[in-house]
């Protein structure tokens, strides 16, 4: 019993040590429009899966709108998971999107499911937020940047 308790305590300590290890420096400062402008896609292509690991730290204003992830975005995420050989569970990692305004444009961004509740409680409609986003690719109509972390401003 004591051995089990020590193992459980060690596992909890290790999990806690890694929980705060988000690598903010891996995200290059930009704007959402700047991040979009860096990439090109063929308009005839329905889906473009990005494998280049492009990460950006961007600012924006939360509009207060959220929704379930749009069907084309879900399909892109499915293809991204398959192409990069991520675990199949990653397909459901981005079940919701939040709308952010930046530079006069509005963007729907998938947010990791474990962060939805904290985002909703910490960021109010009209509030400024710093987003740590990663390019997953593009659908026929839009680029898809997923939120990996956020900081209320």
Regions found by a protein language model. Give the residues of each.
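Sec-dependent N-terminal signal peptides
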Residues: 2-13
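Amphipathic, low-complexity, repeat-rich surface-exposed segments
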Residues: 1-2, 133
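OB-fold and OB-like single-stranded nucleic-acid-recognition modules
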Residues: 18-153
């Amino acid at each position: 019993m004591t051995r089990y308790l020590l193992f459980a305590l060690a596992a909890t300590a290790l999990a806690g040590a890694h929980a705060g290890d988000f690598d903010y420096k891996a995200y290059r400062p930009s704007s959402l429009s700047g991040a979009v402008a860096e990439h090109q896609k063929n308009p005839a292509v329905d889906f473009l899966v990005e494998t280049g690991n492009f990460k950006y730290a961007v600012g924006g204003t939360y509009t207060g709108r959220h929704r379930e992830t749009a069907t084309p975005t879900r399909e892109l995420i499915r293809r991204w998971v398959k192409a990069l050989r991520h675990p199949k569970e990653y397909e459901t990692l981005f079940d919701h999107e939040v709308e952010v305004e930046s530079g006069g444009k509005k963007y729907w961004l998938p947010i990791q499911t474990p962060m939805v509740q904290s985002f909703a409680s910490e960021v109010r409609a009209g509030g400024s937020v710093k987003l740590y986003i990663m390019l997953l690719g593009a659908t026929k109509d839009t680029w898809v940047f997923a939120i990996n972390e956020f900081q209320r401003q």
